[in-house]
Amino acid sequence: MEISALLTSAGINISICIVLLSLYSILRKQPANYCVYFGRRLVCGGARRYDPFWYERFVPSPSWLVKAWETSEDELLAAAGLDAVVFLRMVIFSIRIFFIVAVICIAFVLPVNYYGQPMVHKEIHLESSEVFTIENLKEGSKWLWVHCLALYIITSAACLLLYFEYSTIAKMRLGHITGCASKPSQFTVLIRAIPWSPEQSYSDTLSKFFTNYYSSSYVSHQMVYHNGIIQRLLRDAERMCQTLKHVSPEINCKPSLRPCTFCGGPTATSSFHILSNEADSVKGMELGELTMTTTTTEQERSAAFVFFKTRYDALVVSEVLQSSNPMLWVTDLAPEPHDVYWKNLNIPYRQLWIRKIATLVGAVAFMFVFLIPVTFIQGLTQLVQLSHAFPFLRGILSKNFINQVITGYLPSVILILFFYAVPPLMMYFSALEGCISRSIRKKSACIKVLYFTIWNVFFVNILSGSVIRQLNVFSSVRDIPAQLARAVPTQAGFFMTYCFTSGWASLACEIMQPMALIWNLVAKVVTKNEDESYETLRFPYHTEIPRLLLFGLLGFTNSVIAPLILPFLLIYFFLAYLIYKNQILNVYITKYESGGQYWPIFHNTTIFSLILTQIIALGFFGLKLSTVASGFTIPLILLTLLFSEYCRQRFAPIFNKNPAQVLIDMDRADEISGKMEELHKKLHNVYSQIPLHSQKSSSKAECSNPFKKQELPDPEKLKPEEGDAIAKELWGFQGNESGQEHDTKS
């Protein structure tokens, strides 16, 4: 691929980014778009501000960048939770390591590659991208020691940064456990596969079992019922309530001037009446009473939440095998109430292993089916073969600009469009597996999307050709390093264009929120719906973490092979830090989280990227007949594997299990302070399948908001006119208390 094609792709994507970021800085200042760009603040109780019409509202400004840059990590932790902090630390790690990599490789490796062979160089924009790769070095070149030394520096810096980040995040996770002393999940165990007995109900069987074997620690239990229809009806009713409760009777319930021809009712009065929001028509009823009126023993499922006196008791029960039959009395630590995926608790436990195998087969089959569009896309980068296959295209492809667009821009755009179908499908597969919580489902989807992305974007593209070739390329294990070494330099141009489109342009689309903006416009203009209640989104970790890791993989593998990509990746990571931080603070709401469990995924994938880079470099040193560089690369691979194993032994268990020492100290502190009895009283009503306001389960109550004691400032710090009571009434907004899950992006 020529540099001119890369410049064309870069110019198109830079223009898209500038236009979208400028539009965002204008649209976010419009009062009608507050529910799109400030959904999190509004839901968490921020007051809507009235902005008079003036010129500054229609002028782009970088104030949101300044705000995102100035927000500290402590403020972010209080506002969005540990997962958001861990994600941004992933971005910060990427900025740090690739700054080091870019300085080393651009300063030393790139000049060695460019002047690797005696040749007459053209102007830069007419050069081929392969001139800047290690492919340009001649066999037996003595300059390959520069690449080997750079590889050692990159690996050492990456491992050092990974160690400090792993240590810091492990401490943050322990602080997250101790800082949430009132979490009911720490006292609760989820029991599945309760044995069925024709003589008694599941509830009686469970009560008898735990009274017999855990009489000193067992408190009570809450059965899981098959009341999905009731849940849906109540959820719909609650959403309708949230829609109506923001309606002001004085404004929206004016007498109708049009006679009613259907019901014969009065035409000059309004029959619409808003009830008070006290207990929401269930005042005076206990949660258990309402549950028993809608559920019976026939609707009980073989799953329940069991509550214990101390956190340590719950931990022991969750880790111990309860029966000689491992398929009965299966125990897990319960997820948080708003993290429970109730639908999957109805699945019989004996079906789970079949579901996991089926979803694995489905995911692998989809990965291979995806070879078809990827192979077609790679054909677009090979114009010579394309013109031979389709002779009628030779005239069009002979035009320089069209040639540059097809080779430098179109393939990556088509690949991204195909990839939009991947995250929803992987989320569906993860739900079919039977995950007990939404956070586990999202983590599982994240891993699936990560594998899918690395396989199709990296391996399938660098080993481009027919589908048959994809299956035969790894026929010999010894050929893998050499095959990868030959293929990576040829795809360096494609990876750079993919960085432009999937990186820069995708970030600009992320901050614009085009789907939410269009939906808001349709609701206000087409349907004339002025309701400002907004169903907020959850941060899509299952799509953004794989994208981040993919670019890290591309950066490491191309660092000593084709370092021209590094400055563009560094720009992407810096933009990602500002844009994601802005979105987390203003748009996305945290209703549940994993407690930092995404970091081991990031750590392990980064180690994989380093080892893959070393294997590719080893293959290239072999192709270039440099035995010294090859000999020094093998110990580096072994040292990286040893470092990975040390981190797995030292830090990984903290992310898989809760330490008993910490939980016992928390139990003792609660017993001394007298809080334990109060916690026991709250346990039973927390894990209810029926959503009630009396449960205090609203997103407004659960999201911590560092701005809650302040009025929500205008994005440009514009002050409203004093004493404009009518405007405040018109633009007043109270947060949506339901905070229901937006499944399309959760």
From Swiss-Prot:
The keyword Transmembrane helix applies. Residues 708-723 have a biased composition (Basic and acidic residues). It is a multi-pass membrane protein. It is found in: Membrane. Residues 692-702 have a biased composition (Polar residues). One of its GO terms (cellular component) is membrane. Keywords: Calcium, Ion channel, Ion transport, Membrane, Transmembrane, Transmembrane helix, Transport. One of its GO terms (molecular function) is calcium-activated cation channel activity. The chain crosses the membrane at residues 3-23, 90-110, 144-164, 357-377, 405-425, 445-465, 492-512, 560-580, 601-621, 623-643. Residues 692-723 are annotated as: Disordered. InterPro entries: Csc1-like, CSC1/OSCA1-like_7TM, CSC1/OSCA1-like_cyt, Csc1/OSCA1-like_N. The keyword rRNA processing does not apply. PANTHER family: CSC1-LIKE PROTEIN RXW8, PROBABLE MEMBRANE PROTEIN DUF221-RELATED. This is Hyperosmolality-gated Ca2+ permeable channel 2.1. The gene is OSCA2.1.
